């Protein structure tokens, strides 16, 4: 049975391959905070028993996606092929990468392209300014909660009402700072405002001091490519500057993408 683009298999469906899902879960257990782990740590991170986690780790090791050093496991460079397959299949990235670099050159701030990936926004292109904005390193592949980021809200605003309501129903809103929106009714109001005005601001909701602005990016046919943003330090860039200087810049660059990418 083939599914439509909108249909998603449930884990209970007979076509759902649990072993594949679990193997990917093991790969995704490794991140910046957990680059090397023991078998017990992987089992705990994935909520698997040790025997099951061991089978997946050894299979990934045999396929070249995981390296084993004594008691520790870590991802091997071969996993980059998985991400590169996505990047190479989306040839518009080279155009957008140049746009992001132009934004950084004009503003002196970091700029990124993100796409909605489940309940998160995933960075697929980035131009970094010299100054660091968050405790974690933002790079291609970074995933952040869509509910609390400017790119996430810019993308959520593009969803049909039913899909937005489904997102709000299932998402868990964690508090990261004293400015984090944790009320779902208020979050929906914020997203609907973004839909109306065409841009999104996230002001220190995910990390104290991080202020960002995002707009959606479309190709010449009106297909949503993602959202582009500018990330700033709240102590350096106030909201007035964000709106007066950076919003027109982002809007101009979004038009440039639409005129260039077909």
Regions found by a protein language model. Name each.
Residues 217-220:
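Sensor-regulatory modules in signal-transduction proteins
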Residues 74-171:
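Amphipathic alpha-helical effector-binding/dimerization core
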Residues 226-262:
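Juxtadomain coupling helices with adjacent low-complexity linkers
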Residues 2-94, 101, 255, 259-260:
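N-terminal helix-turn-helix
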Residues 16-20, 76, 89, 93, ...:
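Short, structured helix-loop boundary elements
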Residues 95-103, 168-214, 260:
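Short, basic/aromatic recognition patches
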Residues 126-128, 205, 229:
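Short clusters of small/polar residues that mark proteolytic maturation junctions
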